[in-house]
């Protein structure tokens, strides 16, 4: 059975589930999962775990993300992105300055509250929000706390047809809706807005510049080249690391707790650069949560 992490470049027009389904066929392996959903129209890094590496999938899902995209001021859509229908139109004054936009973007730094868009997979009363939206129903949506580490404009403003668009880059915690961030920024500036393009450039320590498409992976498998499979250690890149000595490693292999002078809730424990376990803080000690020996 093959095992490892794949840095997949998801292309537009497919869901994250579609990507997993196709990889199962390519690799002839059922035990495959992804570490963080991407909307169908969004391209970019989709972390994939295969075989035994699926045991670290939850830590990849929890990791921070980096996105690059484009925000359009002037009109909003039903889906908060370019795929939706026109919802509201507010012509943009060409006197709008980059200074005003940059200042508004700083207001979203740190911990913020978001309300998920109606066209999302968040469940309310056992039903996904997009199911309500498709039925023409709007329901009360639960607020969520997310964290924005960096949010910056990366291009000049382009004024066209009484609209304005510009590129941006954002680094954020899991669960952040970039579509909603684009809409909220527009509201801050006094304009209807939407996210007109998005790609995920980094997730769980994996970078888009080194990601492979499904076609590229299929070609390598055909050639019996499995070098694209990264070690399971890549699945815990976002966890704080601790290097154990031989005695500690033996204790962990038996499932015993360790006394460690650390404060983090979770630790990725290594011995000689090999992942030994994920340790979880319990009172004054650390208990092996998952052992990989």
Swiss-Prot record:
GO terms for molecular function: RNA binding; tRNA pseudouridine(55) synthase activity. Transmembrane segments: none annotated. Keywords: Isomerase, tRNA processing. The keyword Calcium does not apply. GO terms for biological process: mRNA pseudouridine synthesis; tRNA pseudouridine synthesis. Gene3D superfamilies: Pseudouridine synthase. It catalyses: uridine(55) in tRNA = pseudouridine(55) in tRNA. It comes from the Bacteria. PANTHER family: PSEUDOURIDYLATE SYNTHASE TRUB1, TRNA-PSEUDOURIDINE SYNTHASE. Responsible for synthesis of pseudouridine from uracil-55 in the psi GC loop of transfer RNAs. Belongs to the pseudouridine synthase TruB family. Type 1 subfamily. HAMAP family: TruB_bact. This is tRNA pseudouridine synthase B. It comes from Streptococcus mutans serotype c (strain ATCC 700610 / UA159). The lineage of its organism: Bacteria, Bacillati, Bacillota, Bacilli, Lactobacillales. The gene is truB.
């Amino acid at each position: 059975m093959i095992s490892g992490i794949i840095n997949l470049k998801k292309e537009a027009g497919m869901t994250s589930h579609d990507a997993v389904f196709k990889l199962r066929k390519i690799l002839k392996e059922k035990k495959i999962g992804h570490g963080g959903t991407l909307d169908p129209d969004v391209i970019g890094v989709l972390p994939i775990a295969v075989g035994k590496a699926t045991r670290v999938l939850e830590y990849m899902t929890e990791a921070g993300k980096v996105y690059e995209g484009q925000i359009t001021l002037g009109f909003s859509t039903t889906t908060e992105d370019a795929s939706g229908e026109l919802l509201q139109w507010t012509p943009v004054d060409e006197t709008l300055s980059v200074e005003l936009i940059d200042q508004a973007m700083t207001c979203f730094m740190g911990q913020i509250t978001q309300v998920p868009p109606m066209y999302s997979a968040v469940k309310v009363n056992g039903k996904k929000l997009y199911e309500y939206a498709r039925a023409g129903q709007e329901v009360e949506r639960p607020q969520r706390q997310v964290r924005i580490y960096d949010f910056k404009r990366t291009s000049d403003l382009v004024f066209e047809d009484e609209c304005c668009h510009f590129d941006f880059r954002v680094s954020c915690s899991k669960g952040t809706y970039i579509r909603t961030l684009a809409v909220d920024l527009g509201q801050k500036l006094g304009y209807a807005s939407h996210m007109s393009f998005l790609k995920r450039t980094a997730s769980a320590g994996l970078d888009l510049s080194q990601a492979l498409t499904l076609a590229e992976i299929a070609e390598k498998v055909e050639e019996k080249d499995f070098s694209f499979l990264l070690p399971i250690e890549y699945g815990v890149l976002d966890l704080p690391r601790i290097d154990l000595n031989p005695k500690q490693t033996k204790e962990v292999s038996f499932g015993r707790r360790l006394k460690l002078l650390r404060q983090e809730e979770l630790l990725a424990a290594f011995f000689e650069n090999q992942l030994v376990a994920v340790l979880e803080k319990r009172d004054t000690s650390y208990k092996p949560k998952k052992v990989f020996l």
